[in-house]
């Protein structure tokens, strides 16, 4: 036999069972729960968007468009100038609202906006449908764009760079009003003031949709940039009266 092998004489004996006992039966002292009553199960709650679906497109167009004097010929002004003997150096035209300068959506993904994440994505979809995908840019950020922003995942974000001059900026954010009170990441007034200065230097105008009522808005925010209450009570008429 080869070296290192175990011979038959050295094999260990097999163990033999001495007996087998079944475990004692266990008796439950509490009655089992009844089966669920299917008739009492509630269907999942339906999704109710913050903006009324019927007025969303009109509301967004008013909030995101710019007014330019490139509409139809203003005949009344022409007649008035000629009647006063004034020369027509240019043909006066009626004001026209347009979105041809493009829109950039800045969407907040911070903890305070988590309850409104579906509304954020739905609003981005409506903006693209209203303005046109070719005229719509989307950048995401966490709490405030000055900390970094980008169109892709968080790890791809970099320093926020404003778009071309004349682009309308739509900010979807709680402006630091939501989330835990002691959250160290909460955005500050100074950060938003820095963003607005950056946009003004780039010749871009901004409007913010805020998912809180006007009573909760800090006074500095309402003075800093136009705010729109992001809820079903906001109408296109309200936007036309408050947003230039």
Where are these regions (language model features)?
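A short, conserved beta-to-alpha structural element at the edge of catalytic cores
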Residues: 127-151, 198-217
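Conserved acidic
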Residues: 108, 174
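Von Willebrand factor type A / integrin I
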Residues: 165, 175, 180-244
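Hydrophobic, Leu/Ile/Phe/Ala-enriched alpha-helical segments that form helix-helix packing faces
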Residues: 63, 79-83, 123-131, 195-199
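Von Willebrand factor
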Residues: 135-170, 176-178, 193, 212
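…and closely analogous acidic/polar surface helices at protein-protein or active-site interfaces
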Residues: 101, 110-146, 188, 192
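Acidic/polar low-complexity segments with low predicted structural confidence
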Residues: 1-103
């Amino acid at each position: 036999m080869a070296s290192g092998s175990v011979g038959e004489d050295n094999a260990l004996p097999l163990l033999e069972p001495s007996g087998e006992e079944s475990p004692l039966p266990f008796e439950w002292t509490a009655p089992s729960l009844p089966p669920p009553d299917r008739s009492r199960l509630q269907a999942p709650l339906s999704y109710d968007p913050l903006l009324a679906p019927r007025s969303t497109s009109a509301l967004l167009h008013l909030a995101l468009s710019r007014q330019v004097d490139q509409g139809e010929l203003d005949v009344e002004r022409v007649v008035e100038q000629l009647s006063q003997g004034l020369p027509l150096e240019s043909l006066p035209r009626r004001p026209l609202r347009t979105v041809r300068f493009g829109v950039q959506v800045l969407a907040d993904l911070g903890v305070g906006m988590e309850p409104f994440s579906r509304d954020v994505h739905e609003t981005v979809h409506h903006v693209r449908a209203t303005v046109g995908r070719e005229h719509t840019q989307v950048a995401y950020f966490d709490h405030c764009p000055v900390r970094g922003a980008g169109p892709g995942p968080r790890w791809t974000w970099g320093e926020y760079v404003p778009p071309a001059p004349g682009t309308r900026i739509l900010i979807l954010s709680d402006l630091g009003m939501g989330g835990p009170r002691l959250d160290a990441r909460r955005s500050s007034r100074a950060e938003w003031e820095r963003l607005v200065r950056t946009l003004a230097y780039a010749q871009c105008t901004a409007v913010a949709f805020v998912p809180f009522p006007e009573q909760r808005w800090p006074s500095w925010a309402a003075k800093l940039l136009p705010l729109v209450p992001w809820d079903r009570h906001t109408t296109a008429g309200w936007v036309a009266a408050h947003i230039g």
